[in-house]
UniProtKB/Swiss-Prot annotation:
It comes from Thermoanaerobacter sp. (strain X514). Keywords: Cytoplasm, Queuosine biosynthesis, S-adenosyl-L-methionine, Transferase. The keyword Magnesium does not apply. It catalyses: 7-aminomethyl-7-carbaguanosine(34) in tRNA + S-adenosyl-L-methionine = epoxyqueuosine(34) in tRNA + adenine + L-methionine + 2 H(+). This is S-adenosylmethionine:tRNA ribosyltransferase-isomerase. One of its GO terms (cellular component) is cytoplasm.
C-alpha cells in the first residue's frame, strides 16, 4: 500500500495552535464505520453516543517537561535536548540539536549548573545516550528546568503546562500527550460514569516517534517506534467483563488502541501485561480488542491516519477528512475530535 494514498490537502490555518478555553467545547465528528454516515456535534455531548454497559479505556500517562535548553560546558554553544527514553536511573536516550555539538565525551550545563549531561554514545536514528549529574530527585530538577515538548507544528508558546496534560494524567513518562484525552473534563467523566459507562485506565508512555514521518513509499516497509505500556490485572478484568456482557470497548486515542491490540488474545480478551510495543496498524489489520475509538484529526501520511483508516475503512476516513477540512474542523494535538463507532 502506498503512503501517498493517505495524503490530503490541509490549509495551515486549520492546525490548532492552542487549546480551547473549555476542553469539552471542541467539535466532535461522529463516523459510523459500517455505513460511513457522518454527524457533527460538540464533545461535551459525547454521552449521546455512549450506552450503559460500554467501557471507555483511557491512557493515564503524564507528559514530562522533556525539552531542555542548555549550553556546552567548554564553548558555551547553545544545545537543545529532548528526552526520549530512560535507560537506567541517570542514563537517557535523547534527541539533540545541533547534533554537531554533541560529540561523545562532551558535557553540557543546564540552568545554573543544577543539571550536567555527558554524551556517552550515539544511536542508530541520530540520537544520543547521555548520563545526567545532579543533586536530589531527577524529576524535581527536570520540572524546574524542562519545558513541555509540544509538537513541531505548534508554533505558539504554551501558556499553561497543564493544558498539555489530560485531567487524569498520573504516571510520568511521555514525551507527548495522548491528545484524544485532552477533551475530557472531570465533570464530563463523572457524567459518563453516572450513565453506567465504565472508565478504565491503562498506561502507554508516548514517544516522539509518534511524530516521525513515514519515509517509505510502500508503508509496509516502515519501521515503527517502540513505546512502553502497562495493563494492570484490574484494568484487564474490567475490560473483559464488558466484553463478556456484550458492552462496547471504546479506546480513547490511538495510544490506548495500540496498547489494547498489543495485549489482546484472538478472542479480544485482554491480558495483564507490561512491556514494549512496536505494533504498526494499517489497512488490512484485523482488530481484536476494540469496538470504537475517540481520536483527533491526524497528519497526512502519518501512521495515525493509517491506523484510523484500518479501523473505519480508508475511503470512509479520507472522505471524513475532506469534510472536516471543508467544515473547518481544527486539526492535530489541540484540535477537534472524532468518534468512530
Amino acid at each position: 500500500m502506498k503512503r501517498s494514498e493517505f495524503y490530503f490537502e490541509l490549509p495551515e490555518e486549520l492546525i490548532a495552535q492552542e487549546p480551547l478555553e473549555d476542553r469539552a467545547s471542541s467539535r466532535l465528528m461522529i463516523l459510523n464505520k459500517k455505513t460511513g454516515e457522518i454527524e457533527h456535534d460538540i464533545f461535551k455531548n459525547i454521552t449521546k453516543y455512549l450506552k450503559p454497559g460500554d467501557c471507555l479505556v483511557l491512557n493515564n500517562t503524564k507528559v514530562i517537561p522533556a525539552r531542555l535548553i542548555g549550553r556546552r560546558e567548554d564553548s558555551g554553544g547553545k544545545i537543545e535536548f529532548v528526552l526520549l527514553k530512560r535507560i537506567s536511573n541517570n542514563e537517557w536516550e535523547i534527541l539533540v540539536k545541533p547534533g554537531r555539538r554533541a560529540k561523545i565525551g562532551s558535557k553540557f550545563v543546564f540552568g545554573n549548573g543544577e543539571l550536567i549531561a555527558e554524551i556517552l554514545d550515539t544511536t542508530e536514528v541520530g540520537g544520543r545516550i547521555v548520563r545526567f549529574y545532579y543533586e536530589g530527585v531527577f524529576e524535581e530538577v527536570l520540572d524546574k528546568l524542562g519545558e513541555m515538548p509540544v509538537p513541531p507544528y505548534i508554533k505558539k508558546k504554551l501558556k499553561n503546562k497543564d493544558r498539555y496534560q489530560t485531567v487524569y494524567a498520573k504516571y510520568e513518562g511521555s514525551a507527548a500527550a495522548p491528545t484524544a484525552g485532552l477533551h475530557f473534563t472531570e465533570e464530563l467523566l463523572e457524567k459518563i460514569r453516572q450513565m453506567g459507562v465504565k472508565t478504565v485506565f491503562i498506561t502507554l508512555h508516548v514517544g516522539l516517534g509518534t511524530f516521525r514521518p513515514v519515509k517509505e513509499e510502500v508503508i509496509e516497509n516502515h519501521k515503527m517506534h517502540e513505546e512502553f505500556y502497562i495493563v494492570t490485572k484490574e484494568a484487564a478484568e474490567e475490560i473483559n467483563e464488558t466484553r463478556k456482557s456484550g458492552g462496547r470497548i471504546i479506546a480513547v486515542g490511538t495510544t490506548s488502541t495500540r496498547t489494547l491490540e498489543t495485549v489482546a488474545d484472538e478472542d479480544g480478551y485482554i491480558k495483564e501485561k507490561s512491556g514494549w510495543t512496536d505494533i504498526f496498524i494499517y489497512p488490512g489489520y484485523k482488530f481484536k480488542a476494540i469496538d470504537g475509538m475517540i481520536t483527533n484529526f491526524h497528519l497526512p501520511e502519518s501512521t495515525l491516519i493509517m491506523m484510523v483508516s484500518a479501523f473505519a475503512g480508508k475511503e470512509n476516513i479520507m472522505r471524513a477528512y475532506k469534510i472536516a477540512v471543508e467544515k473547518k474542523y481544527r486539526f492535530f494535538s489541540f484540535g477537534d475530535a472524532m468518534l468512530i463507532i
